[in-house]
From Swiss-Prot:
Gene name of the record: ATG18B
Membrane topology recorded in Swiss-Prot or TrEMBL: Peripheral membrane protein
Lineage: Eukaryota, Viridiplantae, Streptophyta, Embryophyta, Tracheophyta
Location in or out of the cell: Preautophagosomal structure membrane; Vacuole membrane
WD repeats mapped onto the chain: 6-44, 178-218, 223-265
GO annotation, cellular component aspect: phagophore assembly site membrane; vacuolar membrane
Domain statement: The first protein part may form a beta-propeller domain involved in specific binding to phosphatidylinositol 3,5-bisphosphate (PIP2), leading to the association of the protein to the membrane.
Keyword Protein transport: yes
Function: The PI(3,5)P2 regulatory complex regulates both the synthesis and turnover of phosphatidylinositol 3,5-bisphosphate (PtdIns(3,5)P2). Required for autophagy.
Pfam families: PROPPIN
Assembly and binders: Component of the PI(3,5)P2 regulatory complex at least composed of ATG18, SAC/FIG4, FAB1 and VAC14.
Protein name per the record: Autophagy-related protein 18b
């Protein structure tokens, strides 16, 4: 879930579902559910302002939290809502405002300022309470896979440490010291194998292997500080091919993880890799950074995901051969949906192509 921007914005919240096949947006008087593939408006409800609208894949179950602008829509009340009936299924009330909600087919996670609650989604029995450092932005990441189901939340307010918690086993997994300054963005791959982090400085993105927290790879987003708005891995059962990031600079950044890490692994076995210190050798080749400048107006909050990856194998093809094609969906907080194709050839040259763009406020049902 991407949270409210400090800048004026007609959109209150944006969220993609667990496989990025659908997304939800809300503003001052309603929320809408869209199909990511077709852009079709699937559901709309004019019932006031909501700060959280979380989907469960493409099912009819939503987790919604009001903005508090109406007495009936308290930010301390979580409503599990059925779109097929238009009625609430269950409600959970808390002492403080709900800042984030995550769920998969078995677990429901509710993030508050200094506590995070884990529930069984089917029975709503509380399974665990996690005490956290103050987390006013509700910063969190969740991997929906039942085999590698992890939650990541900040572990410090003074540096970029992240707590990784196993949501199925109900125990802390590890604590990762990722940055010197506090965290601004976290993402987990859908299979729970990799975690990406960005700090408030916003110049470096780091990727850690969750099972081996000390092993990291660094990608330079830019030279000057910038606010990272979103991080998202591409879909994969193993190592994701792409990590996507958006920032206050208005650019979209794509990092070729699989190519970069595989090349790093080969280099680490060489003599040069063996003599370089970790702080130098973990900085990956900037050639694996594919940036689209000025995709969004500077300062406009945006949220991007990699919806689909197509890989075309072939080692004897000409240099213009497209070896990877990524479909990137972007939502801006001034109300636009954009879809790009990022094509990367076997010489690691890239091309961004805008496939479609439309105003989310102008789409109606029917």
């Amino acid at each position: 879930m991407a949270n409210l921007s400090s800048l004026p914005s007609p959109i209150y919240c944006v969220s993609f579902n667990q496989d990025n096949s659908g997304f939800a947006i809300s503003w001052k008087d309603s929320f809408k559910i869209f199909d990511s593939t077709t852009g079709r408006l699937c559901y709309e409800r004019a019932a006031g302002a909501f700060v959280i609208v979380e989907m469960l894949y493409s099912s009819d179950l939503l987790a919604i939290v009001g903005a508090g602008e109406q007495a009936s829509l308290s930010p301390r009340r979580l409503c599990l809502f059925k779109t097929t009936t238009g009625l609430p299924l269950r409600e959970l009330n808390f002492l403080t405002s709900i800042l984030a909600v995550r769920m998969n087919k078995k677990r429901l996670v509710v993030v508050l300022l200094e506590k995070t609650f884990v529930y069984d989604l089917n029975t709503l029995v509380m399974l665990d309470t996690i005490d956290t450092v103050p987390n006013p932005k509700g910063l969190s990441a969740f991997s929906p896979s039942l085999e590698g189901c992890y939650l990541a939340v900040p572990a410090s307010t003074t540096k970029g440490s992240v707590l990784v918690y196993n949501v199925m086993d109900l125990q802390s997994h590890s604590e990762i010291d990722a940055h010197r300054s506090p965290l601004a963005a976290i993402a987990l791959s859908s299979n729970g194998m990799y975690i990406a982090t960005g700090s408030e400085q916003g110049t470096l993105i780091r990727v850690h292997l969750v099972s081996e927290a000390t092993k990291s790879y660094s990608f330079r987003r830019g030279t000057y500080p910038s606010t990272i708005y979103s991080l998202s891995f591409g879909p994969s059962t193993q190592l994701p091919d792409i990590l996507i990031a958006t920032s206050s600079s208005g650019s979209i950044h794509a990092f070729s993880l699989s190519l970069a890490i595989n090349q790093r692994s080969k280099r680490s076995t060489s003599f040069l890799g063996s003599v370089l210190p970790d702080s130098v050798s973990d900085a990956l080749d900037p050639a694996h950074h594919h940036v689209l400048q000025n995709a969004v107006s500077s300062g406009i909050r945006s949220y991007a995901v990699v919806r689909k990856i197509d890989k075309l194998e072939g080692t004897s093809s000409p240099s213009h051969f497209t070896s990877l094609r990524a479909t990137v969906s972007v939502i801006t907080y001034n109300g636009y949906f954009q879809e790009y194709t990022l094509s990367i050839n076997n010489k690691n040259e890239s091309l961004w192509t805008l496939e479609r763009e439309f105003n989310l406020f102008s789409i109606t049902t029917g």
